[in-house]
């Protein structure tokens, strides 16, 4: 039986070690990002909630590192870490200590899933993680080590057979997709902006997996300026049937703070209302199918106020505590052209994926 939604303990992953990074003063990922979330949750009294437990993250185990990344790539990161010179890719500069920082920021996610497995908590929220662009042979897109892939491997070791990744980050998780593209033991659902307009320029609807994984890789992408109504239209027609079919025993969730209309690096038009809606639906699905086992990983989000409010919304859903961010009015409404594209894309996902799975 799933624990009661109101009695379920939520773990918050926190340690000052998470802040030991420096991509540079002009980089979108700035020092203080994770401390900011922790301070906001302290100010709003979420961290004093009786159902919240602070969990100190452990560095990502070297045994997991060697499974998710090549030795050549790990050696490259070590050398950059020692000298402070070099880069992971053009958007991801190196710095002294990057190897150990990446181990702790990615290790936070794995620490969280282990805490859920051991029943210390049934949900976790990490202000870091969601490094879904890192691939076996390289990092990129602000991502060094792929914590999502590492968590899946750890969960498989612990005996989980139906792991669902619900990735609502506005950028497609190309790295994570590559790890499990032929694996029916992992279902990946990604809602993201049209790859034509945004990094990493992949994650097309036609990419539905292969071999044993055919139909288990789901990509739904949205045109620029898509807002709350079209997003929920697609969500309601795609996501619940997939959950009902797959009946996951563990859920990893990236809530997509960077899909907000005020994010400076992206082009969707969502408000906190939809981020809350998606979080509530995923949370309810975790209790229905996975005995509450839900790991929430912040992922992207480059407006600091939005990132704070997103963290508050997540913790509100996980704990049942009240949190109401300011009323928000996006600059655009969903027009007829956006509606036409989203309806067509939604139907295409249903035609390709549902037929492959027999839904």
Where would I find each of the regions flagged by the language model?
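N-terminal low-complexity, Ser/Thr- and acidic-residue-enriched intrinsically disordered segments
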Residues: 1-63
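A general "terminal functional-core" signal
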Residues: 2-13, 19, 75-359
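Generic structural signal for well-ordered secondary structure
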Residues: 30, 34, 58, 66-70, ...
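A broadly tuned "polar low-complexity/structure-edge" signature
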Residues: 35, 66-67, 136, 148
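Short glycine-centered helix-capping/turn motifs at secondary-structure transition points
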Residues: 44-50, 72, 119, 159
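Charged, often glycine-rich, active-site loop that binds/positions anionic groups
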Residues: 57-82
